[in-house]
């Protein structure tokens, strides 16, 4: 999952720093992630994992780091399996 998120981030994140040099816990907004790029990132993640972000998870915290994105995707996938 981490590798897939990193690939999507590299494609849509428009970051000035190479994604492979960014730590899982690093602040993506401090690394240069814009609000526009975060929307593109979200759409890429939704497509890759066949999920839809619920309104309550559409926030800066969900996309703050690679780890945060991974945790959010896992939360959505767990909820999807339970449904």
UniProtKB/Swiss-Prot annotation:
4'-phosphopantetheine is transferred from CoA to a specific serine of the apo-form of this carrier protein. The keyword Cell membrane does not apply. Transmembrane segments: none annotated. Keywords: Phosphopantetheine, Phosphoprotein. Residues 1-80 form the Carrier domain. InterPro entries: ACP-like_sf, PP-bd_ACP. It comes from the Bacteria. Coiled coil: none annotated. The modification O-(pantetheine 4'-phosphoryl)serine is found at residue 35. Aminoacyl carrier protein. Can be charged with L-alanine, L-glycine or L-serine, via the formation of a thioester bond between the amino acid and the 4'-phosphopantetheinyl prosthetic group, catalyzed by the Atu2573 ligase. This is Aminoacyl carrier protein. It comes from Agrobacterium fabrum (strain C58 / ATCC 33970). The lineage of its organism: Bacteria, Pseudomonadati, Pseudomonadota, Alphaproteobacteria, Hyphomicrobiales.
